[in-house]
């Protein structure tokens, strides 16, 4: 068979881009060689609709083993009673929970997207906002932190069936205990999407939502540093509160509803090659050095946040508890949009993403902020001293975003710096 040089040349271009640049997108990371090897394995050839021991195809006895290992490692990692490793993505995991818990038109409550939430938590352009009645809570304008009092007010008024916590651009830890109290007051289930901080939670550096949430979802990439995919967890399994029964008349456990929601509810065959890669990543996360890595992610984020603040930038909420920070550019550069900032920084081989900030006057296509994070740069072996250097380079570009000479000079420095750092240093 003829080698597809067109595609493999493109793959090599992307490899060089990753190798030469500084990756600061908070949702990105670099996986180990063994995670990539598992993803590129012959397991991709196997169809395996169903779950271990209960498949709709023959010949699944081997992939049953790898999927079972993934489940058991994941449960150990987060101290969970039950886990599903089949969702193809975090959004699919969230959609499965909604499918299990809500009926079309039912009300749920999630964090406003422009305040740090996620598309799959009720955006009108997402299925979650089309199929269900989405209501929202915000962060406080003065502190940039989640307004739990407002969350409670909205919950008491709207009586949601589900309350959703977690977000895509929120740099503080969450008060899961308070959220569970609010959920209990209105008879709602509490779902936490821990996609962004999952690795830090696994390492014991942030609060574990499984102590309070009825259901927890996550991606397996980002801070968790696995392949792209999703998971669903239960700290403790429980009988579904709506009295749904099995054909034998027994009340179904929530785990049964969630399993059915993933397959056959919203997915068909699972990606067993990706599930094997998830198992590898979960195994890595159970090793002692993983905690050291996550502590460095957090330390690097704190150092970067301080460097930005010292340079006169405003960080929403005033700092970070996790791996990320949302920077409001208007304080230092009132006329600079996130779109222009992102383009200029990418040209300098520093990858970030434009992001709306709370109470933003600009659209999602322009934005007044950028989001940055430290998981990927930490995977490459960077430590606190480099964070200050990176912020200095970012500041140089943002002060002259249209100057090709400045951008070229910064790009040369970036490429020189990153020669000293392998893609995966752990």
UniProtKB/Swiss-Prot annotation:
(6S)-5,6,7,8-tetrahydrofolate binds at residues 113, 117-119, 363-365. One of its GO terms (cellular component) is cytosol. PROSITE patterns: SHMT. It is an enzyme of class 2 (transferase). Its EC number is 2.1.2.1. One of its GO terms (biological process) is glycine biosynthetic process from serine. It catalyses: (6R)-5,10-methylene-5,6,7,8-tetrahydrofolate + glycine + H2O = (6S)-5,6,7,8-tetrahydrofolate + L-serine. Its cofactor is pyridoxal 5'-phosphate. The keyword Transferase applies. It is found in: Cytoplasm. Pathway: One-carbon metabolism; tetrahydrofolate interconversion; Amino-acid biosynthesis; glycine biosynthesis; glycine from L-serine: step 1/1. Belongs to the SHMT family. Catalyzes the reversible interconversion of serine and glycine with tetrahydrofolate (THF) serving as the one-carbon carrier. This reaction serves as the major source of one-carbon groups required for the biosynthesis of purines, thymidylate, methionine, and other important biomolecules. Also exhibits THF-independent aldolase activity toward beta-hydroxyamino acids, producing glycine and aldehydes, via a retro-aldol mechanism. Homodimer. This is Serine hydroxymethyltransferase. It comes from Parabacteroides distasonis (strain ATCC 8503 / DSM 20701 / CIP 104284 / JCM 5825 / NCTC 11152). The lineage of its organism: Bacteria, Pseudomonadati, Bacteroidota, Bacteroidia, Bacteroidales. The gene is glyA.
């Amino acid at each position: 068979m003829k080698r597809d040089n067109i595609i493999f040349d493109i793959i090599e271009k992307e490899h060089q881009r990753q190798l030469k640049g500084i990756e600061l997108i908070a949702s990105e990371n670099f996986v180990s060689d063994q995670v990539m090897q598992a993803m590129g394995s012959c397991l991709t050839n196997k169809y395996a609709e169903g779950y271990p021991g209960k498949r709709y195809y023959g010949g699944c006895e081997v992939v049953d083993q790898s999927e079972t290992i993934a489940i058991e490692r994941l449960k150990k990692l987060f101290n969970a009673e039950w886990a599903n490793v089949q969702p193809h993505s975090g959004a699919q995991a969230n959609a499965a929970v909604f499918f299990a818990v809500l009926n079309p038109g039912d009300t749920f409550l999630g964090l406003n997207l422009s305040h740090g939430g996620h598309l799959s938590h009720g955006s009108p352009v997402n299925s979650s906002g089309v199929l269900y009645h989405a209501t929202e809570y915000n962060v406080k304008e003065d502190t940039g932190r989640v307004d739990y009092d407002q969350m409670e007010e909205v919950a008491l008024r709207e009586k949601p069936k589900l309350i959703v916590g977690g977000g895509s651009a929120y740099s503080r830890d969450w008060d899961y205990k308070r959220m569970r109290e609010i959920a209990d007051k209105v008879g709602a289930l509490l779902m936490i999407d821990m996609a962004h901080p999952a690795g830090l939670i696994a390492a014991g550096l942030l609060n574990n939502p499984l102590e309070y949430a009825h259901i927890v979802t996550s991606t397996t990439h980002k801070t968790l540093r696995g392949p792209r995919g999703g998971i669903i967890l239960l700290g403790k399994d429980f009988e579904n509160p709506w009295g749904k029964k099995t054909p034998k008349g027994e009340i179904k456990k929530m785990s049964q509803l969630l399993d059915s929601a993933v397959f056959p509810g919203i997915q068909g065959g699972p990606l067993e090659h990706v599930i094997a890669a998830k198992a590898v990543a979960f195994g890595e996360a159970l090793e002692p050095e993983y905690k050291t890595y996550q502590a460095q992610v957090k330390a690097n984020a704190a150092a970067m946040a301080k460097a930005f603040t010292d340079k006169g930038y405003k960080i929403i909420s005033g700092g970070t508890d996790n791996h990320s920070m949302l920077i409001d550019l208007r304080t230092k550069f009132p006329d600079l949009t996130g779109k222009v900032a992102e383009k200029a920084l990418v040209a300098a081989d520093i990858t970030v993403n434009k992001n709306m900030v709370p109470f933003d006057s600009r659209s999602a296509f322009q934005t007044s902020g950028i989001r940055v994070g430290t998981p990927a740069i930490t995977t490459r072996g960077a430590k606190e001293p480099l964070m200050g250097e990176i912020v200095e380079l970012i500041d140089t570009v943002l002060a002259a975003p249209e100057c090709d000479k400045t951008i070229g000079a910064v790009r040369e420095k970036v490429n020189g710096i990153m020669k000293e750092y392998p893609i995966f240093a752990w």
